[in-house]
Amino acid sequence: MIMLKYNNKLLSDNERIKKNSNFLRGTIEKDLDNNLTGGFNVDNAQLIRFHGMYQQDDRDVRLERMNQKLEPLINMMLRCRLPGGVITSQQWLNIDNFSEEQTLYSSIRLTTRQTFQLHGILKPKLKGIHQLLNKLGLDSIATAGDVNRNVICTANPMESKVHYQIWELSKKISEHLLPKSKAYAEIWLNEKKIESIDSEPILSSVYLPRKFKIAIAVPPVNDVDVYANDLGLVAIKDNTGNLIGFNVLIGGGLAMTYGDKSTYPRMASEFGYINLQDILKIVESVITVQRDWGDRYNRRHAKTKYTLVKVGIDILKKEIENRSGLKFSPMYPYKFTERGDKFGWIRGINQDYWHLTLFIENGRVCNTSNILIKKGLSEIAKVHSGFFRITTNQNLIISEIHQDKKDIIEDLLKQYGLLGDFVTSQRKSSMACVAFPTCPLAMAEAERFLPAFVTKVEHVMSKYNLQRDAIILRVTGCPNGCARAMLAEIGLTGRGIGRYNLYLGGNKNGTRIPRLYKENITEDEILHVLDITIGDWAKNRKTQESYGDYVVRAGIVRAVINSEEDFYL
């Protein structure tokens, strides 16, 4: 294998794969025709990420298949590009049918990036799902890989004029930063190959050093966890409620690598204010600076947060201003006071229409012996002429329900037990990444662990008469940050089967990273810690003081102030 060098240093092997890929084509088509294996070769398994897919296998049956001298049960996970999380009822129905009939797991997974994933797609079914998405006006381009990922924004664009405007902006940003290569259409949609020279004026022929994430938030609600992103845009309104521009945050990211203290979660830094009409120029300039300055030697240090720390805010700001031809103005005052979704019925801009946020535990839309979520949503989609909107907390909004249809849909919700009247505030404040059995990076359970674990936490809360309170609790199977555990009041990250690192001290509004409290401990040990600290909190907290704020004030953990300096202290 030929290793690429630049400035006499070895580049990451991903750089070789991208450079030799012919603008993301590789030999994917050849692998699609290879019936001897259910997967793609090593290089193509990286390239299909740029087309919105991950190669995975079912880890529950990996050993059994190995004993039978079979290759792992290789399958793909596909992630749709859905800026702002908006999907029509008809699109939902078609996706629901495909997931039911053509995937191994018959489920739809709502994600913290405000889109849906389909797990368990076998290689012969791949062209079918891409062609279905295309027929529906959707695609999965650039939802993985070293590109700008799905752009997220505060969930319900029909809540106010500003919410609608930021949804429109999320779509514009997504389109503006898409790869220009025709590889997706040629491979998956059988589009005729035209002899022409591909060009990537924004991303370059080797794309970005690592993934890039953008979020747009409307204060005072930080439902998107805006500080966790490479680029965060905080909407600023004038005195009449009109959107005038954005405070710009740069350099957030929650992933880290165990044992490597040069990696750490980091909250984005404030850079300044930019007027609405100029925001696309700034977004493009931030992307191109990261494209050119990001670390292509060590992927652990390739994210924007490390670029910022390496050169400093002042130098990075000056380069962005030079490239955009704009100047950052001072930040406008803003404040976040809450996260999470607003469950239940609300009216929006048009008083004739209703919107209902449903709790979907861990975002897993499936039918079980206890509840027919998938069937219920399918029946609603058949009579609902509006939209479904996915939230960044893995929940679902049935939106734009006309007054005339409200009773019909409410009856269906009751029939299938979807109203969630029995769901506690604590459960609504908890979420997990997928982890086992499909994620190859998972070290411990997360999605399958969380429901029973939350029940145990609820028992602790009840023990201290805290049933009406809630703690933001998040679990991930590894330290990569998918469920944003590094902005939770209680964060668990998997270390091994049945073992987790326990982090405490994040806050309610998503503006503080928690600190490691106990390392590599079992569920029983975690619950013992929580019993003691929650009991302390119940006895000694100030009025309305949250758990995360209490454990910091009480000295149970020290606040993380500047994570590149004090996260590991």
Swiss-Prot record:
- EC number in record: 1.8.1.2
Whether Nucleotidyltransferase counts among this entry's keywords is: no
| GO CC terms | sulfite reductase complex (NADPH)
EC main class here is oxidoreductase
Q: What InterPro entries does this protein's entry cite?
A: CysI, NiRdtase/SiRdtase_haem-b_fer, Nit/Sulf_reduc_fer-like_dom_sf, NO2/SO3_Rdtase_4Fe4S_dom, NO2/SO3_Rdtase_4Fe4S_prot, NO2/SO3_Rdtase_4Fe4S_sf, NO2/SO3_Rdtase_FeS/sirohaem_BS
Note describing how the cofactor binds: Binds 1 siroheme per subunit.
**Function, as annotated:** Component of the sulfite reductase complex that catalyzes the 6-electron reduction of sulfite to sulfide. This is one of several activities required for the biosynthesis of L-cysteine from sulfate.
Q: Indicate the family of this protein.
A: Belongs to the nitrite and sulfite reductase 4Fe-4S domain family.
- What is the protein name stated in its UniProt record? Sulfite reductase [NADPH] hemoprotein beta-component
User: Which gene underlies this protein?
Assistant: cysI
